[in-house]
Amino acid sequence: MGDKAILTEVLEASNLTEAYVDLTAKQLIKEIRHVGDDFAVRYSNLDDRTELGEPTDQRSPDSEKTFTVDEAVEALGFGRFQLKLSILTGMAWMADAMEMMLLSLISPALACEWGISSVQQALVTTCVFSGMMLSSTFWGKICDRFGRRKGLTFSTLVACIMGVISGMSPHFYVLLFFRGLTGFGIGGVPQSVTLYAEFLPTAQRAKCVVLIESFWAIGAVFEALLAYFVMESFGWRALMFLSSLPLGIFAVASFWLPESARFDMASGHPERALETLQAAARMNRVQLPTGRLVSSTKAGSESRGDIANLLSPDLRKTTILLWCIWAITAFSYYGMVLFTTVLFQSHDECHGGLFSNGTQMEVCQPLTRSDYFDLLSTTLAEFPGLIITVLIIEWFGRKKTMALEYAVFAIFTFLLYFCLDRFTVTVLIFVARAFISGAFQCAYVYTPEVYPTTLRAVGLGTCSAMARIGAIVTPFIAQVASEKSLSLPIGIYGTAAILGLIASLSLPIETKGRQMMDSH
């Protein structure tokens, strides 16, 4: 058989027209190698397709269709795939909450064991949040460049290992060092929201992100219960060991996490994105849109994880306001958590000595069973905060919901100025904590929505870093300044909430009903 006949058979087997017989063997081989599954030939080096007799009559109608990740995610809806993702990413939030709640529980025990001052107690919290602040942007860049799943896995492994080691600390300053490293690992946990949000359809995204925060509430309540049963019998070291275990469990479970399809498209791997979306469609028992998966932007045309892009003209105002909102919210939320312990340890008949010279606290004053019970009661406020946010966020919008929750927090915080009994103080703290918790959830919904895929993780990372600045400062207000006057922290936290209200209403973009962007 001659060369021309062989080439003709190859052309027919490849569904190419006879017009290609005039090509040289080298050209022909190059064209055949570019034949895709839809039999559409790619012309990378030829200017005029018609000269080669493009086989338009050979294409199926579906081969001309395309769809984006946004369209695929909308088609997926909310099903078994998202439920599995909710549980896996929720485990990270539960572990994070336990580590954060731990900070308010161990300080009195450390004061009894090592005789540390209130400033040193505040340093324990400050070191953890310093580590989180330093690492939040780092983990955001890792997730934007190497993938959400890898960043989450490594960050939780670091947090788990350092958390266990810190429980073996022989000295206070050794404890500070390892708690700082624990915080460095925990700084990557918020990226679980980035991964989760990128698989949620627009209509359900806000409610689902808020609902995943219920795992935070579960973790906080579980930590309070754990302390109730463990601290008196086994001490703070045992509590620290047990509190680190969920981080290790999540690190192992993260191997079952899917990589973000949006990340794969943005990083130039559409085949991986399609595999993930097809697996999700099979699990949800739905069909993806017909056609070929394409990106709404050219792969690699925009740098990923570049912090400077957060301050580009179209994002600058949003970014600066979000940094303020996150710092204020963390300052107020963690401040109320720490301040609750201070209030419950006060001996003043007004339960807080609001107009006296101090709280008259002893160096060693461990929490009692009654204190743990009241801490548990105020921690349960996380749940109504979540429910309220879920009910109003889609109706009221993200910005107005945040503003409303800041306003309620400020009102109930200022009410603590009055001379009140312990039960009334507990109720006021319960309501205040419910609404500041809700404001935090709104920030976690809004931030991934407002940033494009190429900046989403680093945007959330920098916001998380700003939150840690607020959290670093707040122990010195809640635990140190309160020794002089409890009226000072109350005034500061109430005023901070008013500033948060103004900042949230000043945000230039409302993301309610808005699809996630791939680029800016």
UniProtKB/Swiss-Prot annotation:
Family according to the record: Belongs to the major facilitator superfamily.
Ranges per topology, Extracellular: 107-120, 179, 230-237, 341-372, 432-434, 488-489
Name of the protein: Putative transporter svop-1
Species of origin: Caenorhabditis elegans
Statement: the UniProt record of this protein carries the keyword Plastid: no
Signal peptide: none
Lineage: Eukaryota, Metazoa, Ecdysozoa, Nematoda, Chromadorea
Transmembrane segments: 86-106, 121-141, 158-178, 180-200, 209-229, 238-258, 320-340, 373-393, 411-431, 435-455, 462-487, 490-509
Cysteine-cysteine disulfides: none
Gene Ontology MF, one: transmembrane transporter activity
Membrane topology: Multi-pass membrane protein
Subcellular location: Membrane
Main localization, broad class: membrane
